[in-house]
């Protein structure tokens, strides 16, 4: 798949610059390559980060000519309600509220919202809103993302 090839191609450059490629999505019409990045040093991704990353990978993409024709390149931050793309992301966001959609239902549900309370191997434990817990195997997670909570809002705005 083209997205995977692009991600594989740009990841070494991203790592060298201190970034992690979260997602790559090439849309054919109109031709747009959207890349979502994060920083390894836990700092926020700023506009200057996106500009520097864009400039660096543009050269790599042009040399390899992996995308035929002209296209627009968009580089953006993962944002507050970011997707969790791998097990490392779940570890990084331990204690955060997330929403998960499952491949196979657990207790007749395929969608849960809860706080990541524990990770042991491939098993992720969520504290649910009804004060119960659920253990989910990482391979059973179809999609997961951070949920923007009132507590997160208070943390962001407390210095303003």
Curated annotation (Swiss-Prot):
Keywords: Cytoplasm, Ribosome biogenesis. GO terms for biological process: ribosomal small subunit assembly; translation. It is found in: Cytoplasm. InterPro entries: Ribosome_maturation_RimP, RimP_C, RimP_C_sf, RimP_N, RimP_N_sf. The keyword Kinase does not apply. SUPFAM superfamilies: YhbC-like, C-terminal domain, YhbC-like, N-terminal domain. CDD domains: YlxS_C. GO terms for cellular component: cytosol. Pfam families: DUF150_C, RimP_N. Required for maturation of 30S ribosomal subunits. PANTHER family: RIBOSOME MATURATION FACTOR RIMP (PTHR33867:SF1). Belongs to the RimP family. This is Ribosome maturation factor RimP. It comes from Orientia tsutsugamushi (strain Ikeda). The lineage of its organism: Bacteria, Pseudomonadati, Pseudomonadota, Alphaproteobacteria, Rickettsiales. The gene is rimP.
